C-alpha cells in the first residue's frame, strides 16, 4: 500500500503533569466527567497515556505521518484554555507531525477572541465538541457564533457522537441526532465531522429527504473497534461513499484491548484495510486524503 500521507484524524494528548497524576488534575480542575472516562472501575482500563516522545515514536513505527490533536469537551472553561495552550506549544514544536484543534466552552470569556487567537497560532479546526456535557446545547447562541466562525475560517468541527441505543458506560451523555441535522441545515457550508462513525448516524443518509442536507458532513472512525462489528466499515463506505470517511483511532485509547497491551495506530489501520478490503484509491482517501481536503 503506497500512500502520500497518513493522518490519524482523531487523537488526544495531555501534558506531562496530567499523565503523571490524572486524578489530581481532574480534581484540581473539577473535571468529574473526564475522570469517570479515564479511570478504570476495575482491572486495566482502556485509557492509555502517551507523552511527546512515546507518541512520535509510535507514529513513526506505525507509519503515521501526522495526527490531529483533538481538544476535549471539558466542563471547566479554564481547562479548555489550558488545553489550547498545550496544543499551541505542541504544534509549534512539531508542526510537521501535529495539527491542532481548539477546545471550546460556551462560558469561556470572549470565545470568539479565543478562536481568533488560536487561528493566529496555526490551529486548523474546533473539536472534539460535546455541548451537552458542558451544560449547553448545539443550538445555543454562543455555540452558533463559534460555528459561524469555523465556517468563515474554513475549519472543520468535530463532535463527539453517542449512539442513541446500545453501549452504556460511566459518563455517557446523549447527543441528539436532530441537532446535528439542524446544524447542517442552518450552516450548509460548515464542514462537520461526526466522531465514532457518527453513532451510526450516517445510515440516515439512506433517507432521500435527509441526504441532500448532509453533503458537508463527514464521519470519523475513532474507537469503532470498541463499538461495532468490523463489517460496519464497508457498509459505511457503501452508504455514504469513501470520500466521507476519516480514519481516526482515539489514540491513546486502547480500542482493541484483547490484542493491545499499549495504544498504537497500526492495529486499527490494518484491521480497517483488511476488513473493508480497501482499494488503493479508497485507502489513500480514508487514511489521509479526506481529512486533508477539508482542512483550511
Protein language model features and the residues they cover:
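A general structural detector for well-ordered alpha-helical segments in enzyme core domains, enriched
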Residues: 54-58, 83-90, 114-118, 142-146, ...
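Short, flexible/disordered intra-domain loops and linkers
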Residues: 41-44, 76-78, 164-174, 256-263
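Active-site environment of divalent metal-dependent phosphoester hydrolases
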Residues: 12-17, 74-77, 106-110, 133-134, ...
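Catalytic pocket-lining loop regions of alpha/beta-barrel enzymes
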Residues: 124-125, 137-247
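Conserved, mostly hydrophobic/aromatic
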Residues: 10, 59, 87, 118, ...
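Mid-to-C-terminal alpha-helical segments outside catalytic/metal-binding sites
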Residues: 2-9, 16-61, 65-66, 234, ...
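Active-site gating/metal-coordination segments in enzymes
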Residues: 65-165, 169-171, 218
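The substrate-binding groove and active-site-proximal loops of carbohydrate-active enzymes
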Residues: 40-46, 129-137, 222
Amino acid at each position: 500500500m503506497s500512500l502520500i500521507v497518513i493522518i490519524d484524524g482523531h487523537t488526544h494528548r495531555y501534558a506531562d503533569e496530567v499523565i503523571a497524576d490524572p486524578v489530581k488534575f481532574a480534581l484540581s480542575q473539577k473535571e468529574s466527567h473526564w475522570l469517570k472516562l479515564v479511570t478504570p472501575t476495575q482491572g486495566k482500563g482502556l485509557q492509555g497515556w502517551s507523552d511527546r516522545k512515546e507518541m512520535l515514536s509510535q507514529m513513526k513505527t506505525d507509519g503515521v505521518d501526522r495526527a490531529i490533536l483533538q481538544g476535549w469537551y471539558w466542563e471547566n472553561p479554564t481547562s479548555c484554555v489550558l488545553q489550547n495552550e498545550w496544543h499551541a506549544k505542541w504544534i509549534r514544536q512539531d508542526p510537521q507531525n501535529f495539527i491542532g484543534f481548539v477546545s471550546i466552552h460556551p462560558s469561556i470569556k470572549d470565545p470568539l477572541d479565543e478562536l481568533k487567537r488560536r487561528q493566529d497560532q496555526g490551529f486548523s479546526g474546533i473539536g472534539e465538541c460535546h455541548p451537552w456535557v458542558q451544560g449547553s446545547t448545539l443550538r445555543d447562541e454562543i455555540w452558533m457564533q463559534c460555528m459561524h466562525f469555523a465556517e468563515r475560517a474554513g475549519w472543520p468541527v468535530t463532535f463527539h457522537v453517542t449512539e442513541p441505543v446500545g453501549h452504556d458506560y460511566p459518563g455517557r451523555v446523549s447527543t441528539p441526532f436532530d441537532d446535528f441535522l439542524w446544524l447542517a441545515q442552518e450552516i450548509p457550508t460548515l464542514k462537520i465531522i461526526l466522531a465514532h462513525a457518527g453513532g451510526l448516524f450516517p445510515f440516515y443518509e439512506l433517507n432521500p429527504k435527509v441526504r441532500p442536507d448532509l453533503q458537508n458532513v463527514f464521519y470519523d472512525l475513532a474507537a469503532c473497534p470498541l463499538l461495532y462489528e468490523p463489517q460496519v466499515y464497508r457498509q459505511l463506505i457503501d452508504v455514504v461513499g469513501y470520500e466521507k470517511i476519516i480514519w481516526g483511532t482515539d489514540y491513546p485509547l486502547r480500542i482493541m484491548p484483547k490484542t493491545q497491551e499499549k495504544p498504537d495506530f497500526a492495529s486499527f489501520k490494518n484491521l480497517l484495510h483488511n476488513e473493508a478490503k480497501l482499494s488503493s484509491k479508497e485507502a489513500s482517501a480514508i487514511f489521509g486524503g479526506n481529512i486533508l481536503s477539508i482542512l483550511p
